[in-house]
């Protein structure tokens, strides 16, 4: 009986670990900051470090975008009638938002390397382009100003 409880707890812990990894790489974790964090200075540097955003080979990401809209509003992009080939990958279909979203574009400052990545901040309004699956947005493919 004790062994069954231990096995159950191990399986439960393992399942939570797998689920946690999926959540950490979701579009919401990577790109959504709503309401916008009130970091007075160095917003991009803080957010990218806080969320551990980097390239797979651990280099600084050259450009990263944070969207300052409710997750529900971003989810609705997947029902947009504006469906098109993604600009970066013509094999994928993208959905474009029907309205412009508030965003912050973080552009890597030349000469900075991981983990001391430094970014220039550009607040913009633009239409987002996302890929979707049955559950909603999967990845931010870009934006159109």
UniProtKB/Swiss-Prot annotation:
InterPro entries: RNaseA (IPR001427), RNaseA-like_dom_sf (IPR036816), RNaseA_domain (IPR023412)
One of the Pfam families matching this protein, by short name: RnaseA
Primary localization: secreted
Family that this chain belongs to: Belongs to the pancreatic ribonuclease family.
Function: Does not exhibit any ribonuclease activity.
Name the UniProt record assigns to this protein: Probable inactive ribonuclease-like protein 12
PANTHER family hit by this protein: INACTIVE RIBONUCLEASE-LIKE PROTEIN 12-RELATED (PTHR11437:SF20), RIBONUCLEASE (PTHR11437)
Coiled-coil residues: none
Highest taxon in the source lineage: Eukaryota
Record localization: Secreted
The species this protein was found in: Mus musculus
Keywords: Secreted, Signal
GO MF annotation: an example: nucleic acid binding
Signal peptide: 1-19
Gene Ontology annotations for the cellular component aspect, listed alphabetically: extracellular region
Recorded name of the encoding gene: Rnase12
């Amino acid at each position: 009986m004790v062994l069954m409880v231990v096995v159950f707890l191990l399986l439960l812990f393992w399942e939570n670990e797998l689920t946690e990894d999926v959540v950490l790489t979701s579009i919401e974790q990577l790109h959504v900051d709503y309401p916008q964090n009130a970091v007075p200075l160095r917003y991009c540097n803080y957010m990218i470090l806080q969320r551990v955003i980097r390239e797979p080979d651990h280099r600084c990401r050259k450009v990263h975008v944070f969207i300052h809209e409710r997750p529900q509003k971003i989810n609705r992009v997947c029902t947009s009638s504006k469906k098109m080939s993604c600009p970066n990958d013509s094999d994928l279909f993208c959905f474009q938002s029907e309205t412009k979203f508030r965003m912050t574009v973080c552009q890597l400052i030349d000469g900075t390397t991981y983990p001391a990545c430094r970014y220039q901040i550009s607040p913009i309004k633009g239409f987002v382009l996302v890929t979707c699956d049955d559950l909603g947005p999967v990845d931010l493919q870009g934006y159109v100003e």
